[in-house]
């Protein structure tokens, strides 16, 4: 029996649309080759039928693999829930609640995303005051790139540092030498030349988030603990715990001394960890502090270094706002103290995190730094940095920018002045509204005191109810202190550098209006109480 591929193709195609019981008589009577006996015809039809069935099966498998959730008939995607029941379980990391996305810190962001303020399109929307982003000096960066287009561009022919080929191919995972050298110089410059940094001890990461997590992986094992003074950056719950399995033990500080950490508080946290079987592996501080907007005093830094040495643990100093200190006292970097203490053996315990997200206002570039005086830590960090690389083009552009001494110096001075002016503007506006703030000298935020407004008997519950009112009524996303693990309820972090001055003034007006409403309600309640008496 001889059958052409043409015939099989026709029969296969027809079988896709016509049920086989109706199809086979039609094939036999009308479209079988001539001079075939009955057996040949039966074989012929069987081949065509099974070819069609096989085609159907293979097509179904192909559709399932390449268009898993697509409804072919309707051209629509089926809901993910339709497939979830048959899927095997995910890992403990994937399903862990340690990410902290249920925190008010992240919930406020979601509320903003659903109803973002826009001066024209949505003037009654939520104003984002929960994002520590520096946009006050973006014009300086844009002007530099406009005047130096070669920094961000490349040539399309040949090879060399400025060529497309050189940027596109694999680079040293440790980072471009030119960029590490420029970064080391910039880190020293923003500290007033009081500390020096070795480019060979710099390990690049995709932002400070990756740098902090990388150090946690290196210094601690799952089940160990990091000691962190409160209040602290809400993202640490995600960055340090979620994937590492490491615990955070809060070092409780309070407003009596401006939330400055004390040796007694450090020891209490260390003992608390030991009491539940957790081994403390490091103290992590932010200097300048997020969310306080303050710097750590030299005496306290010395005390912390003595504490980690005495207890044989490490110190991580997150200094991503080190170039954003705009008022006295000046920043004292732990790098200064390491150099001053010389050969007392402390250097191997000290690790610094830095980033260009805050001081340079470039969070989208994802550039972070692990700087360690410990060679073993540097080696381990380099090995792990392959999971969190910075693109060659980003490094090339920033190497040119930071190597320009005149530009870098002018940027630092202008940015500090603008941040100081913004800070003073916000503090004055809040004071007019009757809201005091902790005295700050750094960062992109103020630490606002609304303890007297606490609802429902105070405490964290009262703070969250107040936060909800600020979010839903005043349409302001402001981070509550409880999301920063503050030991006192009623404090809020207010960011001021991520918006225009007009938007900031509107936000201050909304706070003032909110306070007027609260004062009126309080006065009315007081009058009613007097009448009852």
Curated annotation (Swiss-Prot):
Reactions this protein catalyses: S-adenosyl-L-methionine = 1-aminocyclopropane-1-carboxylate + S-methyl-5'-thioadenosine + H(+)
Purpose of the protein: Catalyzes the formation of 1-aminocyclopropane-1-carboxylate, a direct precursor of ethylene in higher plants.
Modified sites of kind N6-(pyridoxal phosphate)lysine: 358
UniProt enzyme class: lyase
Lineage, broadest ranks: Eukaryota, Viridiplantae, Streptophyta, Embryophyta, Tracheophyta
Signal sequence range: none
Pathway entry: Alkene biosynthesis; ethylene biosynthesis via S-adenosyl-L-methionine; ethylene from S-adenosyl-L-methionine: step 1/2
Cofactor field: pyridoxal 5'-phosphate
Keywords: Ethylene biosynthesis, Lyase, Pyridoxal phosphate, S-adenosyl-L-methionine
Name of the molecule in the record: 1-aminocyclopropane-1-carboxylate synthase 5
Gene that this sequence comes from: ACS5
Family: Belongs to the class-I pyridoxal-phosphate-dependent aminotransferase family.
Gene Ontology MF terms in the entry: lyase activity; pyridoxal phosphate binding; transaminase activity
Pfam family for this entry, one: Aminotran_1_2
Kinase as UniProt keyword: no
């Amino acid at each position: 029996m001889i059958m052409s591929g043409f015939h099989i193709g026709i029969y296969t195609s027809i079988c896709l649309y016509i049920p086989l019981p109706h199809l086979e008589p039609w094939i036999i009577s009308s479209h079988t080759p001539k001079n075939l006996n009955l057996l040949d015809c039966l074989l012929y039809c069987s081949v065509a039928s099974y070819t069609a069935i096989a085609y159907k099966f293979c097509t179904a498998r192909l559709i399932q693999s390449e268009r898993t959730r697509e409804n072919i008939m309707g051209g629509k995607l089926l809901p993910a829930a339709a497939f979830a029941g048959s899927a095997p379980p995910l890992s403990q990391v994937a399903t862990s609640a340690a990410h902290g996305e249920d925190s008010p810190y992240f919930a406020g962001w979601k509320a903003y995303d659903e109803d973002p303020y826009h001066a024209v399109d949505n003037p009654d929307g939520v104003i984002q005051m929960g994002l520590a982003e520096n946009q006050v000096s973006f014009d300086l960066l844009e002007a530099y790139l406009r005047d130096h287009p070669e920094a961000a561009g490349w040539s399309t022919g040949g090879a060399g540092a400025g060529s497309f080929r050189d940027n596109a191919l694999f680079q040293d995972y440790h980072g471009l030498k030119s960029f590490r050298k420029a970064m080391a110089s910039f880190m020293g410059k923003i500290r007033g030349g009081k500390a020096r940094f070795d480019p060979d001890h710099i390990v690049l990461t995709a932002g400070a988030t990756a740098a902090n997590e990388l150090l946690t992986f290196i210094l601690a094992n799952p089940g160990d603990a990091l000691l962190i003074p409160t209040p602290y950056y809400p993202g640490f719950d995600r960055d340090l715990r979620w994937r590492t399995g490491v615990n955070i033990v809060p070092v409780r500080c309070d407003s009596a001394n401006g939330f400055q950490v004390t040796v007694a508080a450090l020891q209490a946290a260390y003992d608390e960890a030991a009491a539940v079987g957790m081994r403390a592996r490091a103290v992590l501080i932010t200097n300048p502090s997020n969310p306080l907007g303050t710097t750590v005093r030299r005496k306290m830094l010395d005390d912390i270094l003595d504490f980690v040495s005495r207890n044989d643990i490490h110190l991580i100093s997150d200094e991503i706002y080190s170039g954003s200190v705009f008022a006295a006292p000046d920043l004292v970097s732990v790098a200064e103290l390491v150099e001053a203490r010389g050969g007392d053996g402390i250097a191997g315990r000290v690790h610094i995190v830095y980033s260009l997200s805050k001081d340079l206002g470039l969070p989208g570039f994802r550039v972070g730094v692990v700087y360690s005086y410990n060679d073993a830590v540097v080696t381990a960090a380099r090995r792990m940095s392959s999971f969190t690389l910075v693109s060659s083009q980003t490094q090339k552009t920033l190497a040119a920018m930071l190597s320009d001494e005149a530009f870098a110096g002018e940027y630092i001075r202008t940015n500090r002045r603008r941040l100081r002016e913004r800070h003073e503007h916000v503090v004055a506006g809040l004071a007019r509204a009757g809201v005091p703030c902790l005295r700050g000298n750094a960062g992109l935020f103020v630490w606002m005191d609304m303890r007297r407004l606490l609802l429902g008997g105070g405490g964290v519950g009262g703070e969250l109810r107040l936060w909800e009112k600020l979010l839903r009524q005043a349409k302001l996303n402001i981070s509550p202190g409880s999301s920063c693990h503050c030991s006192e309820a009623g404090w809020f972090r207010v960011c001021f550098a991520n918006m225009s001055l007009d938007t900031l003034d509107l936000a201050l007006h909304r706070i003032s209006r909110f306070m007027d409403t609260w004062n009126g309600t309080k006065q009315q309640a007081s009058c009613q109480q007097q009448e009852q008496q």
